[in-house]
Amino acid sequence: MDSITSYNVTQMNGDTKQEKCDDVLSTSSTQKFCGGCRKKLRSLLPVNYKTEIVELLKLAGPVFISQLMIFLISFVSTVFCGHLGKTELAGVALAIAVINVTGISIGSGLASACDTLISQTFGSNNLKRVGVILQRGILILLLACFPCWALLINTEPILLAVRQSPNVASLSQLYVKIFMPALPAAFMYQLQGRYLQNQGIIWPQVITGAAGNILNALINYVFLHLLELGVAGSAAANTISQYSLAVFLYVYIRWKNLHKATWDGWSRDCLQEWGAFIRLALPSMLMLCVEWWTYEIGGFLAGLISETELGAQSVVYELATIAYMFPLGFAVAASVRVGNALGAGNTERAKLSAKVALVCGVLVSCVVATLIGCTKDVIAYIFTTEEEIVSRVSQVMIMYGFFHLFDAIAGITGGIVRGAGKQLLGALCNIVGYYFVGFPTGVSLMFALSMGIIGLWIGFFGCVFLQSLFFIILIYKLDWKKATQEALIRAGVQLTETKDESFGLENKGCTEEAAKESQITEEGLTDANTDLEGLSKGGEGISEAGAKTTVGAVLTTKQLIVRRGLAVLLMVLILAGGIVLNEMLVRYLR
């Protein structure tokens, strides 16, 4: 009996050992299999791609949040005005549209010149020149307020001319007049944001934007609910909120010393190179404004059909704005990364940033488009309970998913174009795409075929499809070596050939003529691309010794006084002309 028991125990122990061996072998096999999978995944995604994805996401995520904060300022104002009445709500909605078209879009577009100038200069490590570019932007954007004011002061005549209700037009003019002093603050907030984001600093905009929105909600509540100031209270709340955003961000920059590396005090150099700044600023403005204006006009045209079409268009436009913020984050990140790399002379990293940003943005946009498609029948209930509007929005959303994908591609590639400094081609593409293809097609389908806003969005789809195709071809055909040369010139640095025939970067205030005669000519760069890649990783190794803050021909003091004085005089005359025109038109139209 004991022998049988002993045998059984021995047999059990043997079975246990065998099971343990099998478990070990199984675990070992699993680990080998998982390890092999990880190795295969690593081989599919090179290390430099993973690093680039991480860097892009670090920028794109906060950009999305900061843009959402900006959007919420006007959105909250509209929501608070909802209880005032239809006439008041219509007046505020039209006023905000006019402010966006003739004000905010102008400042935001002009500030986009910094997407090229600051990103490339920061990448070159010529840091003090970044501060001078900021000063230049401050002066130019403040002057840009004058023609914007000349348009804004004529809001009522413009609305009366397009047959809006006199009461609505009058309320819109009241709102705009109260908001007008906030325009410089809105412009400065845009410029400060560009100054930081092109250095890879994003979170301050998120933090100050959140604080500004909290203050905006409180002020709207006090002015509209407690004090019952109506439309004037809403405008005053918006004005205070714009100043709070600009002041909060300025204080944060000073508090955290984010300006120390790039700011060397006000310099007379900021009066130089206005032509170079404007040559980038105007196409940048057109790239943004052409698109922005088209959608705003689309809303007005929808109102000519019926209130249902107008309501549906308003909902679709709000949804499109929110959805676009996802690819916008990647567009900004691509612009920053490409500009930084070109300024550092790192051509290959610039191309890598462009590829990774486009792929990541498209993947995220596919997810967003899928979500919109799955919720198309209910998503409009966020904004309204009117069944006719909900049904109309649902019909547009069927097509909008495809529109969003190509809109994302166009937006991200547009960011790459800005980072490379090719805004002129981008502006021409947008003008042709929207005003010669998309908008005429949409309006024809909208009215001639009685398709309403569905026809309008079909026209917009054709536009973004052509846009995305053009930008992809442009980036594919882009001479990246030449783009690197141009970035180095803008950044105030140039290539110098050393004794061992390698290339280095030297900070110089070279003129374009001198640059053409130097080693940075296209012929001199036939074999330089490999050398360029090893020069700098984000600007390291580029000495600031002898750095110049001015590039190109330097104007004398007398020339500066005359030219900048004439610029100021011209802006003041434009504003004066707007005031005189307003007095004449109001009397005539009334």
UniProtKB/Swiss-Prot annotation:
- Those parts of the protein on the Extracellular side are 81-88, 159-167, 223-231, 295-313, 373-395, 452, 587-590
A GO term, aspect molecular function: antiporter activity
Q: Which InterPro entries match?
A: MATE_euk (IPR045069), MATE_fam (IPR002528)
Q: How is the protein disposed in the membrane? A: Multi-pass membrane protein
**Matches recorded under CDD domains:** MATE_eukaryotic
Which is one Gene Ontology cellular component term of this protein?
A: apical plasma membrane
Which GO biological process categories is it annotated with?
Answer: organic cation transport; xenobiotic detoxification by transmembrane export across the plasma membrane
| Alphabetically ordered keywords of this record | Cell membrane, Membrane, Transmembrane, Transmembrane helix, Transport
Q: Report TM segments.
A: 60-80, 89-109, 138-158, 168-188, 200-222, 232-254, 275-294, 314-334, 352-372, 396-416, 431-451, 453-473, 566-586
Q: Which residues lie on this side of the membrane: Cytoplasmic?
A: 1-59, 110-137, 189-199, 255-274, 335-351, 417-430, 474-565
Cellular localization per UniProt: Cell membrane
Q: Where's it mainly located?
A: membrane
Spell out the NCBIfam families in the cross-references: matE (TIGR00797)
User: Family assignment?
Assistant: Belongs to the multi antimicrobial extrusion (MATE) (TC 2.A.66.1) family.
Functional description taken from the UniProt entry: Solute transporter for tetraethylammonium (TEA), cimetidine, metformin, guanidine, N-methylnicotinamide (NMN) and also the zwitterionic cephalosporin cephalexin. Responsible for the secretion of cationic drugs across the brush border membranes.
This protein is called Multidrug and toxin extrusion protein 1
Q: Which organism is it from?
A: Danio rerio (Zebrafish)
